[in-house]
Regions:
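A contiguous, low-structure linker/loop signature
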Residues: 73-131, 157
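Catalytic domains of carbohydrate-active enzymes, especially glycoside hydrolases
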Residues: 48-67, 209-216
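Short, charge-rich binding segments
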Residues: 55-58, 80-85, 150-154
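Active-site loop segments of alpha/beta catalytic cores
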Residues: 1-42, 51, 114-310
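Aromatic-acidic/polar surface patches that form glycan- and anion
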Residues: 45
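Short, glycine/charge-rich beta-strand/loop segments that flank catalytic centers
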Residues: 66-80, 165-168
Length: 310
């Protein structure tokens, strides 16, 4: 049984020859430990793809979660100059006059000098037409140029997973602050649900395109759906139906497992998360970070869902 087969067995509720091993490292960790060149790592598709593969080989992982699927290949051509920054970082000057500081172990910090467009604070300020419809045929050709070479090089031996951010995560991102998005759910439930519907249709496009390329599983990133943000009732209203639609579509059209990543306080809603049809759950945080005890969760979930570490 190879790694790909091992993961497939575990994700489908069967017994593999041993417990599979894989982990999603932070991009900062990958940059610090597997990026020979920070510019290549952050601004070329090859750099990040190589780091994903190197990490999996170093730690003998059974799978790779590709959390960033593509990178604009013209970015290096837009660089004017690269200088040395503090603590091993880099300072990038761009031809458009902006600049970025790249720490050795964290995301680039971009400084354009142009004030950011203010996002709405209230749902009445939200223009639904600003949620542009995503069409697969209109996606840039490079949208999956990190995922594709990983599938080509490691897809026969390792379990390769794709990822989408859920509609609810993106909905909160439409507003100036997270709390503004949460208040919007109360202030105008109908408008919020229409925004979620439109966003979920766009998420489906990215999910389908990754599935079509041959991923073995799809992760739904839903970090704000725990009790620290939403009650059970609001979860049922604003999260469950949209994640259920996404998972049912992937199951029906591609037959691959899906799993949900929600951090923190989810001990009160594991039963609701199962109602999405998910095949697995990721990130069962114990107290004090979360509200889930692994033993209790295992008994509740039973054979209905696999448990995956983060």
């Amino acid at each position: 049984m190879n790694a790909k087969e091992r993961m497939a067995q575990a994700m489908r509720g069967r017994t593999p020859d041993r417990t599979p091993l894989m982990c999603q490292f932070s991009l900062g960790y990958l940059a610090k430990n597997f990026a020979g060149d920070l510019i290549r790592f952050w601004y070329t598709p090859e750099g990040l793809a190589e780091a994903y593969i190197a990490a999996a080989e170093t730690y003998h992982f059974d799978g790779i979660l590709v959390s960033i699927s593509g990178r604009d290949p013209t970015l290096p051509q837009q660089i004017q100059h690269v200088g040395e920054g503090e603590h091993g970082g880099k300072i990038v000057s761009w031809k458009n006059g902006s600049w970025s500081f790249i720490p050795s172990n964290d995301f680039p910090q971009d400084h354009s000098g142009v004030p950011e467009t203010k996002k709405p604070s209230f749902i009445e300020e939200l223009d639904l037409d600003s949620i542009s419809r995503v069409r697969a045929e209109a996606l840039p050709g490079w949208t999956f140029n990190i995922l594709e070479p990983i599938l080509q090089e490691k897809g026969r031996e390792l379990s390769i997973h794709g990822e989408v951010g859920t509609g609810f995560e993106q909905f909160l991102g439409l507003f100036d602050k997270l709390e503004d998005g949460l208040m919007a759910l109360i202030d105008d439930e109908g408008k919020a649900k229409e925004a979620l519907r439109r966003l979920n249709q766009n998420v489906l496009v990215y999910a389908r395109e990754q599935c079509r390329r041959g991923i073995d599983a799809l992760k739904l990133s839903s970090p704000y759906a725990g009790a620290g943000f939403l009650s059970r009732r609001m979860y049922q209203e604003f999260v469950l139906p949209y994640e259920q639609e996404l998972i049912e579509t992937v199951h029906r059209e591609y037959g691959i497992p899906c799993y949900i990543h929600t951090c923190g306080a989810i001990g009160d809603r594991l039963d609701l998360m199962l109602q999405t049809g998910t095949d697995g759950l990721e990130c069962l945080d114990p107290p004090p970070l979360g509200t889930v005890e692994l033993k209790e969760a295992s008994l509740l979930l039973g054979p209905n869902a696999f448990i995956k570490g983060n």
